[in-house]
A protein has these predicted regions:
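Interaction-surface and assembly-scaffold signal
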Residues: 3-5, 9-11, 107-266
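Structured soluble/peripheral alpha/beta segments that form catalytic or ligand/cofactor-binding pockets
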Residues: 10-13, 25-29, 34, 42, ...
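Acidic/histidine-enriched active-site and ligand-binding environments that engage anionic O-linkages
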Residues: 47
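Intrinsic-disorder/low-complexity recognition with aromatic hotspots
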Residues: 20-23
Length: 266
């Protein structure tokens, strides 16, 4: 329990880190298409765009064996690596510290803090994400009563990268990780929906304007994940993507005309 962990404690910690389980999950997702050139531009190599420029905006809440209860929101984009189709985590927001730290340190998810809520009343489902008083995106859907079959297995891609201690460049090449999810869906409802994306200096979601809404999905499920490092990208090549996943530090000068909080909400 102290600052120096025993071998027994380390084993328990690593077992939890290596085998995350998320139970009683509830999630609203809106699938939509963007321009192919837009999707290709935001994908870091070695990820490749898929034939369908699919983006998924989602809001949900979860219980877990490793980071407690939390709610969150995310933007995933379709991508492929060596022929394995998955979803690249472009942006992801959590309402608690533990899932943020876990996602960043272990998996490489670009997690930031935000307020996220999911609402369901009958066939109507909605979700929203807000950060520092500014809306990030909102989802609204009406379920048709049609039930689908959720994927028993799915994949997400992330990059682990570290800013150099000097402030210039990265400490080493970025690592591409792949998480394999084993899903057990109890509810997988299909419907129609809409998504509203709000851009800002730190969260440029306006780059993902939908050209076609595919469908809305409301799901309830349990899932477990295993993550592995599958590739690397040269630090200089990944640097623009690395900083694109963060807030813009150059806009957070206390001596500027706006305070840091005002910069985040402008």
């Amino acid at each position: 329990m102290g600052y120096i962990k025993s071998q027994e404690e380390i084993a328990q910690i690593e077992n939890a880190l290596a085998r995350p389980v998320y139970r009683n999950s509830q999630r609203l997702a809106i699938e939509f298409l963007i321009e192919k050139k837009s999707l290709a531009r935001i994908l870091p190599p070695p990820l490749q765009p898929t034939d369908t420029p699919l983006v998924v905006a989602s809001v949900g809440r979860w219980q877990s064996n490793v980071v407690g209860d939390f709610s969150g929101a995310a933007i995933h984009v379709a991508a492929s690596h060596h022929g394995v189709l998955g979803m690249y985590v472009l942006a992801i927001y959590m309402n608690r510290e533990h899932p943020i730290i876990y996602g960043r340190d272990v998996v490489g998810e670009p997690k930031k803090w935000a307020h996220a809520e999911l609402f369901k009343g009958g066939s109507l489902v909605s979700g929203l994400a807000e950060r520092n008083g500014r809306p990030l995106f909102s989802l609204n859907a009406e379920m048709s009563g049609e039930s689908g079959i959720g994927p028993a297995q799915s994949f997400t891609y992330n990059f682990k990268s570290r800013t150099s201690a000097s402030g210039y460049g990265l400490e080493e090449d970025a690592i591409l990780t792949k998480t394999t999810w084993k899903n057990d869906f109890r509810v997988f409802e299909i419907g129609e929906g809409e998504v509203k994306l709000v851009g800002g200096p730190h969260d440029p979601l306006e780059e993902l304007q939908p050209i076609e809404i595919i469908r809305a999905i409301y799901s309830e499920y349990d899932t477990s994940g295993t993550c592995e490092a599958v590739d690397k990208i040269e630090s200089k090549t990944f640097l623009p993507f690395h900083y694109g996943r963060m807030d813009s530090w150059n806009l957070l000068d206390s001596n500027s005309h706006m305070s840091p909080h005002e910069e985040l909400t402008s």
